[in-house]
Design a protein with these regions (language model features):
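Extreme N-terminal basic, low-complexity initiation segments
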Residues: 2-10
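Basic, polyanion-binding surface patches
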Residues: 33-241
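A cross-taxon signal for low-complexity, glycine/charged-rich
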Residues: 3, 14, 26-34
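N-terminal basic, low-structured, amphipathic or hydrophobic segments
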Residues: 19-22
Length: 241
């Protein structure tokens, strides 16, 4: 690890206005941006990061939470949060989560070909956290976390009744990740097509889903770090022509 300085010369802030930027709430101001000299911490991941905590998770953040419900072939239901989760395609709508080991969720989805994703919100934060407990395969995290399973309409997997948004999904593919050198990582990316969507109508205003109304929570850096998304944090930025 080593530190080095990046110097950008002839910085002209008056030429760095951001076109199309409009804030939706009072108190948020548009400012000019200027890149200046930085004292950089540099490292190569293969040699270690040299910090108290690996910054990778904190840099690639915030990340939506993959709160995944699944059912085993014998009917046992599972609920677990995953911090590596996102959407990957519009048509068809595809979401995916990565598991850092072959866990019950992945096994269940491979066996049945189905799963549900449930939106984790501020109101459900403690319940979501409780469902992360390492328990025996036959223990239901729904019951452990005090949540209500509701049968899916398309898939045979329950969703979280208390969550304002849920997706029913069918398995697209499970991929074992690998490094640039071709070595297999102990991580599996599970991708699924969204075949049904459940939205609390209170989250919809004038025909538009309002992300902030649900107060979603998203993963930050260390094991216990999260952010809450609020309506007042939103701003709109129109793409240039």
């Amino acid at each position: 690890m080593r530190k080095h300085r990046t110097v950008v010369r002839n910085c002209a802030p008056e030429n760095l206005e951001i076109p199309g930027l409009r804030f939706a709430h009072p108190g948020m101001t548009e400012g000019k941006r200027c890149v200046t000299a930085k004292d950089l911490h540099f490292y190569e991941p293969k040699n270690g990061h040299g910090l108290k905590h690996d910054p990778f998770n904190a840099i690639v953040a915030p990340r939506p939470i993959g709160w995944i419900s699944s059912r085993g072939p014998k009917g046992n239901i599972n609920l677990a949060p995953y911090s590596f989760f996102n959407a990957f395609c519009y048509v068809p709508p595809i979401i995916g989560f990565s598991s850092t080991s072959w866990k019950d969720s992945v096994q269940n989805i491979q066996d049945t070909g189905e799963f549900c994703w449930n939106l984790a919100t501020m109101d459900l934060a403690r319940h979501m956290n409780a469902s992360a407990a390492h328990v025996a395969r036959d223990v239901s995290e729904f019951e452990l976390a005090g949540l209500t399973p509701v049968p899916g309409k398309i898939v045979g997997v329950p969703r979280v009744a208390e969550s304002p948004v849920s997706f029913e999904c069918k398995l697209s593919q499970i991929l074992q990740l690998q490094g640039a050198d071709g070595r297999k990582a102990q991580a599996w990316l599970t991708l699924g097509e969204v075949v049904a969507v459940h939205i609390d109508k209170a989250m919809i205003k004038d025909g538009v889903y309002q992300t902030g109304l649900a107060h979603p929570i998203v993963r930050a850096g260390r094991k216990g770090d999260y952010f809450e998304i609020k309506p007042e944090n939103m701003f709109e930025m129109v793409r240039p022509d």
